[in-house]
């Protein structure tokens, strides 16, 4: 049997399991470190060993059990970086890259201080530190396991960020030019909308929040003035249903600030910005 036929068989099964067939080739290529051209060539070769067949089947079994491809290969790409990821942290999403791009585009000043609340793998903090090496970036998370992984990623990227174990602002004592957060924002009532590979594998602490998904936003809104410099800004990622309720929270608690809601590349409400600009 050629490798292409073996792949076809397992891909059909993955589709029946509700998973993306393309994940099989993505994981295989990543683990084998094959270019696309080399992979196409490999597909035409006969599977001559039980070891090779078992290798493909092992990948299939993990995907069929709804394990995300990024966890299988132990890596996710984010803003030009290869970040280590596993079940300790949420897998960085493309939408969050848009949040990073927005921050970099709107803030060209040097020597700014940034606080990333709920840093997880460190994706946002590291992307900002990489592209603004003169900025001072603090990455906070309630999970020590997440901070341990963020520290690994910082070391692997040869970047300096300050890591702090903190439940929102509980262990924060400074004021910052920029506060950014991609907090857990999915309501428990919306659990049925979450894909099985996310629901079964990614940390629920980083996915779900009380108060219809608004709990962390409320805490940030209520306390931000104590940790934000006078001309400081807040950048948030939000769920697509939260384009009205999250801005309302920040207008209530920071009435002197402008609050904007921006859409992502898919046309969904995805970012909220709190700043001193004029509407």
UniProtKB/Swiss-Prot annotation:
**What is the main EC category here?**
transferase
* CDD domains in UniProt: AdoMet_MTases (cd02440)
Output the Gene Ontology terms for molecular function: nucleic acid binding; protein-(glutamine-N5) methyltransferase activity; protein-glutamine N-methyltransferase activity
Q: Where along the chain is S-adenosyl-L-methionine bound?
A: 118-122, 141, 182
Question: One Pfam family for this entry, by name?
Answer: MTS
Say if the entry is tagged with keyword Transferase: yes
List the InterPro entries hit by this protein, alphabetically.
Answer: DNA_methylase_N6_adenine_CS, HemK-like, N5-glutamine_MTase, PrmC_N, RF_methyltr_PrmC, SAM-dependent_MTases_sf, Small_mtfrase_dom
Q: What Enzyme Commission number(s) apply to this enzyme?
A: 2.1.1.297
Q: Kindly state a single biological-process term from the GO annotations of this entry.
A: translational termination
- List the SUPFAM superfamilies hit by this protein, alphabetically: S-adenosyl-L-methionine-dependent methyltransferases (SSF53335)
Which keywords, in A-to-Z order, does the entry hold?
Methyltransferase, S-adenosyl-L-methionine, Transferase
Per UniProt, where does substrate bind? 182-185
Reactions accelerated catalytically: L-glutaminyl-[peptide chain release factor] + S-adenosyl-L-methionine = N(5)-methyl-L-glutaminyl-[peptide chain release factor] + S-adenosyl-L-homocysteine + H(+)
User: What is this protein for, i.e. what is its function?
Assistant: Methylates the class 1 translation termination release factors RF1/PrfA and RF2/PrfB on the glutamine residue of the universally conserved GGQ motif.
Describe the family membership recorded for this protein in Swiss-Prot or TrEMBL.
Answer: Belongs to the protein N5-glutamine methyltransferase family. PrmC subfamily.
Entry-linked NCBIfam families: hemK_fam (TIGR00536), RF_mod_PrmC (TIGR03534)
Report what the protein is called: Release factor glutamine methyltransferase
Which organism was this protein described from? Answer: Streptococcus pneumoniae (strain ATCC BAA-255 / R6)
Lineage, top ranks = Bacteria, Bacillati, Bacillota, Bacilli, Lactobacillales
Q: Which gene encodes it?
A: prmC
């Amino acid at each position: 049997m050629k490798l292409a036929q073996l792949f076809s068989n397992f891909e059909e099964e993955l589709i029946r399991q509700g998973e993306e067939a393309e994940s099989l080739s993505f994981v295989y290529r990543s683990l084998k470190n094959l270019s696309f051209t080399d992979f196409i060539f490999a597909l035409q070769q006969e599977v001559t060993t039980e070891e090779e067949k078992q290798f493909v089947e092992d990948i299939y079994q993990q995907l069929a059990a709804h394990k995300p491809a990024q966890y299988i290969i132990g890596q996710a790409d984010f803003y030009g970086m290869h970040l280590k990821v596993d079940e300790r942290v949420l897998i960085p999403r493309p939408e969050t890259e848009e949040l990073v791009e927005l921050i970099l585009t709107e803030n060209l000043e040097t020597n700014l201080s940034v606080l990333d609340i709920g840093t997880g793998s460190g994706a946002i903090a590291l992307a900002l530190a990489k592209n603004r090496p003169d900025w001072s970036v603090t990455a906070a998370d309630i999970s020590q396991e997440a901070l341990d992984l963020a520290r690994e990623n910082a070391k692997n990227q040869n970047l300096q960020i300050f890591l702090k174990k903190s439940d929102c602002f509980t262990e924060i004592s400074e004021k910052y030019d920029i506060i950014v957060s991609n907090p857990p924002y999915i309501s428990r009532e919306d659990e049925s909308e979450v894909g099985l590979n996310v629901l079964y594998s990614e940390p629920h602490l980083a996915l779900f929040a009380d108060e219809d998904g608004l709990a962390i936003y409320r805490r940030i809104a209520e306390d931000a003035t104590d940790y934000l410099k006078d001309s400081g800004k807040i950048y948030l990622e939000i769920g697509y249903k939260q384009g009205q309720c999250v801005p309302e929270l920040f207008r209530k608690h920071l009435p002197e600030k402008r609050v904007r809601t921006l859409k992502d590349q898919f046309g969904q409400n995805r970012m909220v910005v709190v700043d001193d600009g004029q509407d």
